[in-house]
Amino acid sequence: MDSSGTVRNQTSDDHSRPADAAGTAATLYGAPAETRSPRRSRFTVRDVAAAKSRGERWSMLTAYDFTTATVFDEAEIPVLLVGDSAANVVYGYDTTVPVTVDELIPLVRAVVRGAPHAMVVADLPFGSYQAGPEQALATATRFLKEGGAQAVKLEGGARVAPAVAALVGAGIPVIGHLGLTPQSIHALGGYRVQGRDEAGEVLLADALAIEAAGAFAVVLEVVPADLAARVTKELHIATVGIGAGADCDAQVLVWQDMAGLSGGHVPRFVKRYADLRTVLGDAVRTYRDEVRGGQYPTVEHSY
């Protein structure tokens, strides 16, 4: 990682993009940091593995539409997750349980069109893979064929390892998800920290099972920081933290939370990097008032 925070790839001998002719180190996307080219290549599972081996951290954000996907891609966010959190922030459901494959695939298509450089990961929603490997493969195939996703994510530990193995065997990259798994919120009894005390050993065993099944990364959500650090050290694949401390290989947030657009309760692990809810609200109210008062449109905005 350079002084500006840019994650840099390995040399061509260790499965990464080479430096340019002048010897300038390449960025995560393969272009020199000083002269980034608009023709960046798409981030891949090999880049994730290379970052893990070099101890380089990377970021992930959710995305659900074309416009925000273009912004995140231009900002060089390497991985975009079309999460089942769309159930909450797009469709207005109370939990992630109701959202369907048919509701998510159009969102995946939009994000893929808006992000030609990021890896786009699609969440497998509740009820679309729990029946077993055959159902999981059918669902994941739809997300790749119809949505254009490059990888999928699914929740669960050892119990879903056969499904993970089936997907990987079919050539579909997989991210696991452990800890607080929102699709199981009713079984967990609410949104609370997972993996304390002896439950931490179970979580570690689940992480190892997901790795053995062939996943290239695993999300750790709302688990103690020391446990996440231990899992990260034990695994050869990347860990992606969300409320799991600072030692994970990567971090992910719901973009509306990160940018201050979400209303209501905000989890402790969220850092708001902007206050878009206030900015957008002010802009909308100003527009409303100017239309009412005849101040908009003016000659400047007329033909």
Curated annotation (Swiss-Prot):
It holds the Pfam family Pantoate_transf. Residues 1-41 are annotated as: Disordered. 3-methyl-2-oxobutanoate binds at residues 84-85, 123, 153. GO terms for cellular component: cytoplasm. The keyword Transferase applies. GO terms for biological process: pantothenate biosynthetic process. Its EC number is 2.1.2.11. Coiled coil: none annotated. Its main location: cytoplasm. It catalyses: 3-methyl-2-oxobutanoate + (6R)-5,10-methylene-5,6,7,8-tetrahydrofolate + H2O = 2-dehydropantoate + (6S)-5,6,7,8-tetrahydrofolate. InterPro entries: Pantoate_hydroxy_MeTrfase, Pyrv/PenolPyrv_kinase-like_dom, Pyrv_kinase-like_dom_sf. The active site is at 221 (proton acceptor). Binds 1 Mg(2+) ion per subunit. This is 3-methyl-2-oxobutanoate hydroxymethyltransferase. Its cofactor is Mg(2+). It is an enzyme of class 2 (transferase). Mg(2+) binds at residues 84, 123, 155. One of its GO terms (molecular function) is magnesium ion binding. It is found in: Cytoplasm. Belongs to the PanB family.
